[in-house]
Amino acid sequence: MMFCSFNMRKRNKITYELKNQDLKRSILSVIIGVTKINRWGIMMKDERIGWPAYFMMQAAMLASRSTCTRLHVGAVVVKDGRIIASGYNGSVTGTPHCTEVGDLIVDGHCIRAVHAEQNALMQLAKMGIAAEGAEIYVTDFPCVHCTKFLLQAGIKKINYIRNYNNDEFATSLIQAKGVALQQVPLTATDVAMINFDKYVTENN
C-alpha cells in the first residue's frame, strides 16, 4: 500500500509540474509575445511573415516598377509555394513609357499598357512553363480581360489586395470555373516586419 501511495504521489507531482509548465508558457507568451512552441518544445516568438503576405508584398514591390501613370499593379505567379513568374503593368518592351510620353487613352483605357497579369503569363510562355494549377497574387482585382487569360491558362486561385472596378462578368466567370478568389489584405504588422533600414549601405 505504501508503494502504491508513493507512486500515486509521484504521478500527481509530475502532472502538477506539467500543468504548471503549461501555465508558465501561457503567461510568458502574453508577456514577451511568444506565439508558438517549436518541435523541441522551445518557446519562440514568430517574427516571420506569413506566405500570403510575403507573396503579396512581392507583388507590391513589383508594382513600384510600373510605368503607368494611373495605377501601379504588380503580380506574381506561385506554384508549389515557389514564385515561377512575375510582372507589372507598363508599355511593350522597347517602346515609350507612359511616364515619358503620357497615357494613350481609348474608351477610358490606356491601350499603351500591358497589364501585370498578362506580363506574368507571357513570361511563363517564353520560359515554356505551364501555369496550370498555379495561383496568382496581384495587387488589384484583375480586369475582365486578364481574368479570362488567367482562367484560360489554368490558374486555380486568384489572390488580390485591393478592389478596383471589380467587373461582375469577371466575377461570374471565376465562379463558373470554380477558381478560388481571395482578398489578402496587408496589415501594418505585416509591413512593419520588413525593416529595409537595416539593409541601407549608403546615404544619398
Please annotate each region the language model reported.
Residues N7, N12, N20-D22, N38:
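Intrinsic-disorder-associated, low-complexity terminal segments enriched in Asp/Asn/His/Tyr and depleted
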Residues S26-N204:
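Zinc-dependent deaminase catalytic domain
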Residues M1, D22-R25:
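Compositionally biased, low-complexity segments
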